[in-house]
Amino acid sequence: MKLERAVQIGIVVRDLDRTTELLSKIFGIGPFHFIEWPNRPESKYFFRGRPEPIKLRQAFVQVGALELELIQPLEGENNAFKEFLDERGEGIHHILFETPSMDDTVSQLKEQGIEVLQNGDGIRPGTRWALLDTQALVGFLLELRHRPGDSDGASIS
């Protein structure tokens, strides 16, 4: 197995408005697209294999070939975003790779001892994602995403 297409860097923040304003004002990054997730009633979210309530506020922006995802946890005690913020503070949380087969990729990684930390449905219908428990192994979390059909790499249109 080889992960070949990195499409996103995820950054956890305490104040999404402040962070996006600073990135825009100082570095000219933007415009940002904001969303609260889950954004559909049928969206599912699991942390360490158990369904958990969660609410996030996110901002997305394309910067060259990579998308930046800024994440502010709003609700829910049991999730990797709040855990990261509580233990490490703000910062780079994950790198996301597209995968052609979520089930096959996760199965191959489990054979190597890498477990799914959290997973769920994506913003776009039909999208699945899995955040892998790789912090101790490589110093950051790896996220996988699968969407049916061709993917342009962007989380939202």
Can you say where each PLM-predicted feature lies in the sequence?
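Conserved short beta-strand elements that form part of the metal-binding/catalytic scaffold
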Residues: 30-83, 125-149
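Residues within well-ordered alpha-helices
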Residues: 19-20, 57, 105
